[in-house]
Design a protein with these regions (language model features):
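Conserved short histidine dyad/triad with adjacent acidic residue
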Residues: 48-67
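Phosphate-end processing signature that detects enzymes handling 5′-triphosphorylated RNA
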Residues: 93-112, 126
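A short hydrophobic beta-strand segment most commonly corresponding to one strand
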Residues: 72-77, 100-102, 117-133
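Non-heme Fe(II)/2-oxoglutarate
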Residues: 1-39
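Fe(II)/2-oxoglutarate
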Residues: 139-186
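A short beta-strand-loop-beta hairpin characteristic of the jelly-roll/cupin
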Residues: 59, 77-97
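Short connector loops at helix/strand junctions that flank enzyme active sites
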Residues: 41-43, 52-54, 69-73, 79-81
Length: 186
């Protein structure tokens, strides 16, 4: 459910042209509205995101979600469980309910809910500005050049990986051999 979205639609999850506005759903959550309004600058997309038990979100990049780029993505876990596996660039992230976390989602990341209960996070995207940057430790602010170099390696690896996977899938289909339906994620 979107609390802030393009055009104020609580069901519109995409970044669309136009102004990001609060949705009617946010009227039901004044405490969350106070959290969102407490950050300097303009919020873009803000969502309550749920991952059901046994659901996967496979490796992907959110290209503009970095302190070095256009938007900063902040997470506040609301409900989680010990079966959740979340990685950013193969680094395990264990985020507990009520904590505020920044992740550089321009790096590859994935998650899996291996537990028996849903995982719910308040996920907030804010346009990068100097006041927001000032909230981050100096080491994170100063690491932009290093992150760009590492991010390029990740992007190059993604290109190679896709070529190998697509080539393998083509060969497998030519031989009419079916690949396995599941692969272990973690």
């Amino acid at each position: 459910v979107c609390l802030v979205s393009s055009g104020g639609d609580p069901y519109e999850d995409r970044y669309l042209d136009g102004v990001f506005t609060k949705t009617p759903a946010l009227n039901l959550a004044p405490y969350m509205e106070g959290i969102i309004d407490g950050f300097p600058g303009r919020s873009s997309r803000v969502r309550l995101m749920q991952l059901r038990p046994r659901e996967n979100v496979f490796w992907h990049f959110d290209g503009w979600q970095s302190l070095d780029k256009r938007y900063v993505r902040l997470h506040i876990p609301i409900v989680t469980n010990s079966g959740v596996r979340f990685q950013i660039s193969h680094e395990d992230c264990r985020w507990r309910p009520g904590e505020l976390w920044y992740g550089d989602f321009a790096f590859p990341h994935r998650l899996y809910n291996g537990g028996d209960s849903p995982r719910v996070h308040l996920v907030m995207d804010f346009a990068v500005n100097n006041d927001l940057k000032a909230l981050f430790p100096r080491a994170i602010q100063d690491g932009a050049k290093t992150r760009r170099k590492i991010r390029k390696l990740c992007t190059d690896s993604k290109v190679v990986y896709r070529k190998v996977v697509y080539r393998t899938v083509q060969v497998v289909h030519r031989q009419t051999v079916q690949p396995p339906l599941t692969w272990p994620l973690f």
